[in-house]
């Protein structure tokens, strides 16, 4: 399969919501500096993922691919195709819940995408997600973010919404302080930022 031919960083994104938005944001952030290959549209299914990964070429410097599942057993095949080096877990919600016995079971299935990644980015404030990551004894770097835990890798000090803009103030790894502005105010987009 063509993925093995490319020894480059590959970001794998999963979650119940926000996969496409986060993928497109990462593309916008990375593409001025790097040649990025990404999933077209919302190609995150058993058919869409292979089509997306086939887009990798000799010029690609980093790949960004979504992985979506709707039932148990689907993520292992997607993991084998994407082979991510970095993982992003956007959110854990009730989408496609009807095929899973519990939210925890769905979370554990989604986390299979990140089995061999060097790092995973996720919300520590989602207790189910945080507990599932702890239970899996994840070996990579946990780049957790939190609005509650000052010791999180990315601590959100404050979120200020004004007019149609949101300002997020943060502390990175308890050392670097900064802020960024978003051109929207809805909670889902702010959380995925």
State the predicted function of each range.
Residues 1-125, 129-141:
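Phosphate-binding loop of NTP-binding sites
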Residues 103-104, 140-193:
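Adenine nucleotide phosphate-binding catalytic loops in nucleotide-utilizing enzymes
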